Swiss-Prot record:
PANTHER family per UniProt: 50S RIBOSOMAL PROTEIN L36 2 (PTHR47781), LARGE RIBOSOMAL SUBUNIT PROTEIN BL36B (PTHR47781:SF1)
Gene name for this UniProt entry: rpmJ
Protein name per the record: Large ribosomal subunit protein bL36
Organism annotation: Orientia tsutsugamushi (strain Boryong) (Rickettsia tsutsugamushi)
NCBIfam families: PRK00831.1
SUPFAM superfamilies, sorted: Ribosomal protein L36
C-alpha cells in the first residue's frame, strides 16, 4: 500500500479505483487489481 499526501492522481490510475473513508482515513481501493491501493496521510 502506498501512503501519499494527495490521492488525486492515484484514483485516476485505473477505471475500477474507488475512494473510501474508513476509520477516519481516506483510502483508494481496487477490487479488480489489488496493486492500486493507497492511503492518505
Amino acid at each position: 500500500m502506498k501512503v501519499v499526501s494527495s490521492l488525486k492522481s492515484l484514483k485516476n490510475r485505473d477505471k475500477s479505483c474507488q475512494v473510501v473513508k474508513r476509520r477516519g482515513k481516506i483510502f483508494v481501493i481496487n477490487k479488480k487489481n489489488k496493486k492500486f491501493k493507497a492511503r492518505q496521510g
